[in-house]
Amino acid sequence: QEYAAEEVVNAIHFIEEQTGEKFDWDAFFKSMKRFNAETEEFLEWMEISKTDYPQVMGVTLALYRYGVYQAAGGRNQAFLDMDKKLTKMALDAYKNKEMAAKEYRHRAMTWGVQAAYYTALPIWLLNCWGVVTIADMLSMVSTEMVNTEDKHQAMLDLAYLYENMIMRNRSNGGYETGVEALWRFCEMFNIDIVIMYVHMGCKSMSGYHGLFEEEARKHGIHLIWVTHNLMCPED
């Protein structure tokens, strides 16, 4: 962890040397406070998703979260303002026991290398089959807070988040984060179906194929493989 934090600091020093600019700790801590607040809102949605009346879910959760933690990163107040609006709407809908479909027959988790720009599948599953997608693999990262007082601890925390980003964690991070974590989320959200995406142009999780099937049987989880090659630049 110290090594990872050192690499972040080295990157900061390199940019300072090349540009002549100095790293603004005040601006950084301000962004991280906002980033932490965004994370807290997300965790609130996930608490609701553990119940029978999930609200922020499916592609609504997925596409929005990608923008929040990957692109905005606490730098834009508009995202936090929207987070708070979403939380209020979600809490109101939860209290009223509102549902996105007439019936939820199954609770699903999407895993694997998904097509972030192809949003029709979860909507089709919900409207035609009553399969509600509670959460997805790419949304379940960046859930830890960054220290906003101590510079060294802040670098350690930031490095941890970088270490646990999508391809460094789930798809290329090994058995514990790629396979074992899935079943923890299934238990957390009472999932009974896993939609396992297989990207024909990205084979990073293909070696786990048999392990996923074996573990799914052990946990009593239905596993559905969805092969795609969407949004591939070679096409």
Regions of interest found by a model, annotated:
Residues A5, V9-V146, S171:
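A charged, amphipathic alpha-helical module
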Residues Q1-F23, S139-M140, E144-D235:
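Trp/Phe/Arg-rich N-terminal binding region typifying the photolyase-homology
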